[in-house]
Regions:
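Aromatic/hydrophobic pocket-lining residues that form the small-molecule binding cavity
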Residues: 9, 13, 46, 50, ...
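Short, acidic/polar
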Residues: 41-56, 113-121, 222
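A short, structured active-site edge motif that brings together acidic residues
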Residues: 24-37, 136
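Beta/alpha (TIM)-barrel catalytic core signal, keyed to glycine-rich beta->alpha loops juxtaposed to Asp/Glu
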Residues: 70-246
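CE4/NodB-like, metal-dependent polysaccharide N-deacetylase domain
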Residues: 45-66, 97, 101
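N-terminal binding-site loop/beta-alpha segment at the start of enzyme catalytic domains
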Residues: 1-26
Length: 246
């Protein structure tokens, strides 16, 4: 995303990709978070952010460009409503135009925020992909019914994406690190609505008390759980070091 380390993350990737043989094909994606409070139009924001990302990534096209904002009932400082996305000349129409001018091949959304407006946007078929919250703490996106689950209910979200033939990317497999390690970095902020960080910590401890080391260490279990969901086409991982990858 263009906001990660103020663009340095994209620059690092661009430097690496430009040093690799042309024959090595990678799929490149990025994300843009729009400012609904800005006097700059959404169209201008997307054009500017996309062009800057392309420059940092040293490419003339992205395979996937995603809307980074949460989708909520009411507009927030960094959140958009379904109406702002779906209205004529709204975000969806603007992002379709960047496909038409060949700067991106596919467009996607981040399926965080309030479940109903997220599903409303998904069910239009406007977007090609969705980043879906899915991990050991909340796997409800793959459920048909919420049942007794008492965290935010994302049930039927994956089913909706499948109906629209969308690519489905699992995100937050480590729950901001809570599932991966006991070490805390201070940015463990829940992105769901129903439970706080203290309750998430309690549930993490219960999970690992039951499962133990059966499936490897904590990080390995969390990744395996994400990869085990056959309805997800890929799992997005955040890695800071080569040791994390290994």
């Amino acid at each position: 995303a263009e906001t990660y380390s103020e663009g340095q993350s994209e620059k690092n990737i661009g430097d690496l990709l430009s040093a690799l043989p042309v024959k090595d094909k990678f799929y490149i994606s990025s994300k843009a978070r729009l400012d609904p409070k800005s006097s700059e139009s959404f169209g201008s924001q997307i054009d500017r952010k996309l062009d800057n990302s392309l420059k940092r990534l040293k490419t003339d096209k992205l395979d996937l460009y995603q809307l980074h904002n949460k989708i909520t009932f009411e507009e927030g400082v960094e959140t958009l409503t379904s109406a702002q996305i779906l209205e004529k000349n709204g975000v969806c129409d603007i992002m379709e135009k960047i496909k038409e001018d060949s700067r991106v091949d596919h467009i996607g959304l981040t399926a965080l925020g309030d479940t109903k407006p997220i599903r409303d946007v998904v069910n239009t078929g406007c977007f090609d992909t969705a980043q879906i919250y899915y991990n050991l703490l909340n796997p409800t996106a793959t459920f048909k019914e919420k049942g007794i689950w008492n965290d935010q209910d994302f049930s039927n979200l994956v089913s909706d994406c499948q109906t629209q033939n969308m690519g489905i990317l699992g995100i937050r497999v480590f729950a901001a690190g809570l599932l991966a390690t006991d070490i805390r970095h201070g940015r463990e902020i829940p992105v769901t609505h129903m439970i706080d960080i203290k309750e998430e910590e309690r549930r993490v401890q219960r999970i690992y008390k039951v499962v133990g080391q059966t499936y490897g260490n904590r990080a390995q279990l969390a990744v395996r759980y994400g990869l085990s969901a056959e309805s997800l086409h890929c799992t997005v991982l955040g890695l800071a070091t080569l040791e994390h990858l290994q």
